[in-house]
Amino acid sequence: MKLEVFAPRAAHGDKMGSDLEGAGSSDVPSPLSAAGDDSLGSDGDCAANSPAAGSGAGDLEGGGGERNSSGGASTQDDPEVTDGSRTQASPVGPCAGSVGGGEGARSKPYTRRPKPPYSYIALIAMAIRDSAGGRLTLAEINEYLMGKFPFFRGSYTGWRNSVRHNLSLNDCFVKVLRDPSRPWGKDNYWMLNPNSEYTFADGVFRRRRKRLSHRTTVSASGYGGGSPPGPAGTPQPAPTAGSSPIARSPARQEEGSSPASKFSSSFAIDSILSKPFRSRRDGTPALGVQLPWSAAPCPPLRAYPALLPASSGGALLPLCAYGAAEPTLLASRGAEVQPAAPLFVAPLSTAAPAKPFRGPETAGAAHLYCPLRLPTALQAAAACGPGPHLSYRVETLLA
């Protein structure tokens, strides 16, 4: 029986509903609507069960000149439904108005007063300096800032954290304990560090010391030296504020490049190259070429044939005759230089045996023959007096 009822539900249900309405039993719920509508929750069923759709369907089905009891009830219920729809629609208006008001509140710009053109260090230092005792607590600093600047009187309160951080993280502020026995206590005083007065110099509150002050004074003195002094009665023109070393005129550049405007010091390159070297221990006039070290008086040696008898058994080795082309480097202090005679530094010594002597005919060039133990020979030369300092290696030719 149920299969026969639910099979033609789409077409037969409307007809059954119209028959029931014609019979005047609209108050009794139909089994089709009770079972089918609850079990099937489609959109069409929801639209059919809605009050507005039901009233519209009742008007259509009970249209014409036929008015039954159900139709009368529907006509009586129509004002209620319309009133209900109006009552349901009426809350939508206030909600829309509230939503619109919320959007308007969000779109309203947030007004914040302009921040004063000072850093927090400057503001805190200003508050401490204006105090009678030269020290204030954190609450007193906040009260001073709120009373002096409108920015701190608004709803924004994040500046209080900035004040606390700047007090505790900068060395220019010193905390003075109210009770030394309770260093962890609050309401301590804050005052300016007397050792950090440079931070508040020239009316400018700086976070740290300026590092370009020395360079600025040196450059200012360098540029000042380039300008020629005027007459005694003529005042010097003051430099303009926009003038800079880069944007100077060509005449200024030529004046700045003159030797008088350059950096004058004993360590300047021009000063070092222009002045000859003078020994501090000796005030005698310097020669044409000066040595950067002290040279010991060493008489010029003759050629090697005169030195041969000094050797025992002819045990000598040839040594490269360095410095023969540069007699000025090995010249003695205050002695005249003989460019014709070759100069040698190491004297002869028979402290160590060496290979037999070979004549200059086999060697093909004139050589100075000295012992193989060259440091001993140099030590013997140093025993006579302070020997010259050699700035290069001694080259030896081993046969």
Curated annotation (Swiss-Prot):
Instruction: Map out region (Disordered) in residue numbers.
Output: 1-112, 211-263
Write one Pfam family the protein is assigned to: Forkhead
Q: Which residues form the signal peptide?
A: none
Which residues fall in a compositionally biased region of kind Pro residues? Answer: 228-238
Q: Which UniProt keywords apply?
A: DNA-binding, Nucleus, Transcription, Transcription regulation
What organism does this protein naturally occur in?
A: Rattus norvegicus (Rat)
Q: Where in the cell is it found?
A: Nucleus
Q: Spans of biased composition, class Gly residues?
A: 55-66
Residue ranges of DNA binding:
114-205
Q: Which PROSITE patterns match?
A: FORK_HEAD_1, FORK_HEAD_2, FORK_HEAD_3
Q: Name one GO cellular component term.
A: nucleus
- Could you tell me what this protein is called? Forkhead box protein Q1
Instruction: Write out the GO MF terms.
Output: DNA-binding transcription factor activity, RNA polymerase II-specific; DNA-binding transcription repressor activity, RNA polymerase II-specific; RNA polymerase II cis-regulatory region sequence-specific DNA binding; sequence-specific double-stranded DNA binding
**Function statement:** Plays a role in hair follicle differentiation.
